[in-house]
Amino acid sequence: MDLRRRIVSRQGEFLLFALTPPRLSTSSEQAQEIADVTRERLEPLGVDGLILYDIDDESDRNPDERPFPFLPTMDPADYLDRHLQAWPTPVVVYRATAKYTEQDLRDWMSTQDTAGRMAVFVGASSQEKPVATTLRIAQRLRTEVNPDLLLGGVAIPERHARKGAEHLRLVAKQEAGCSYFVSQIVYDVNAAKNLVSDYAYECRDRGIDPVPIVFTLSVCGSMKTLEFLRWLGIDVPRWIENDLRHANDTLDASVEHAEATALELMSFCRRLGVPFGISVESVSIRKLEIEASVRLAGRLANRLMR
């Protein structure tokens, strides 16, 4: 069963691989080389789909110095059309709606083949950010322009830990047309389980079926990468930080932690009857970290009931 049918039927148990497009300064030839190598790496895994991120500068959200400088990347839709057009499974394209005018979004959505393209809309990173199109308007446009385009939303366990209402945001997004959710990178498994539990019982109380939640896992090859994850707003429990800091091999230790987190979430969702997917994120340009992400995806592929 392909990814679209799994999501529509709310069955879950699928595997995605998430990528950041090359830097904006990358030549067309180099971008094609990157795309070709990516396909070679992922082909043996049999992933059910790809995610392409839409990277935005989030310094307005966090005034602290960014551990790694912000470098603009290619538009994920352009990268897909020009360099990954032969990819064989569905692709989820992120759209940071604040960056695009309503006409931009209309034009893009109207040309999407809904059999092989899906979307996740992400709102502005802070109230101070200039907004070309709000998340709510973008959701409405999708209903008007291309209602068959499967739409996803973001799920943020950390926000649920702080405010306790993320499950209500998920239900509201579901009512606005979202067919699935994708989490931020999960390091705090308890925060993710709390969100899943509250969402599951809220759906039960309202008499609606939960939609798939895709949990994002990522490896971490250095303490500076860990610092960057925190800058992005991801909660990393101190015991995990201690494990990674004192490990003989930080990267290998992070793979073990990510796998354990994924397996715990799989078991929990199956028990609660919440459909789920797994996304392994690879955003590093370091070959060792990319290969570790592929290795993690391979391990998790064997644990899914696909």
What is each of the regions a protein language model found here?
Residues 87, 144-146, 202-209, 272-273, ...:
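Short helix-capping segments at alpha-helix termini
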